[in-house]
Amino acid sequence: MKLTAFAFEIKDSVAHITLDQADRGNPLDRHFAEEFNELATECSINPDIRSVLIDAKGRFFSVGGDLNALAKDRAELAHFVSAATADLHMAISRFARMNAPVVVVVHALAAGGAVALLAGADFVLAAPAAKFYAAFSAIGIISDSGGSYFLPRRMGSRRATQFLMLNETLTAEEAAESGLINRVVAPEALADEAWQLASRLAQGPTLAFGELKNLLIASATETLESQLENEARAMARVTRTDDAWNAMQAVLAKQKATFKGR
């Protein structure tokens, strides 16, 4: 896979994805969208990948959309945006629904679509210096990248409305208090703690994690009865896995369960 917007490696069942256009602020441009979708596909279908760790190089996590590209040609703007979001939105959906849990590490400013993108991750860790800037209303547009879906679920509907309409910038502590991120980690410990979390998840019951991720997504729109039925069907599927059976036997034998992701 040839990449220009990212660095990518797989180590110990963790797919490590790094935003790698530091000289441009890691923008969510067409190259980003296309390659992010390629990476999402790889992480979805590769059985050796059991968790995903996303971080970034440079002064910013991401400045969000590429305003220079957006403001270049008014006649083509709608077509340009539609083409770019097609790949980006497919990627976000794949990361949200894949079996592998996704961990995002934010060391600095995340703006616009980057905030929406990280809101879709399963875990988000941030340095104290990280900031989260809504950005969209500043240029007269609306949230994309799943922001209108994930932000209300992380922050609550009223808080998400305030964040987006008033074009707020949250500190790392404010983001943690709002539910946008999991926790704030000292900068010197951030990379290690994120890797430990991704590694721990990579050693877990991957297929069960995937079922849980999809149940949590469905819970926002399902009735109680339909969600109970979804749970029953998912439980039937996971109890057929080697991981579930072997873990039950290990617990009965007072041994530590070892999960293989199958």
Predicted regions and their residues:
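Hydrophobic alpha-helical membrane-association signature
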Residues: F32-E35, A84-D87, L117, L190, ...
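Conserved CoA-thioester-binding segment of acyl-CoA-metabolizing enzymes
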Residues: M1-K57, S93
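Terminal peptide-recognition signature
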Residues: I17, Q21, F36, I54, ...
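Crotonase-fold acyl-CoA enzyme core
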Residues: S93-F209, R233-M248, Q255, R262
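Short, charged, surface-exposed hinge/linker loops at domain edges
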Residues: L216-E222
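Glycine- (often His-adjacent) and acidic-residue-rich active-site loop
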Residues: A56-A91, A110, T223
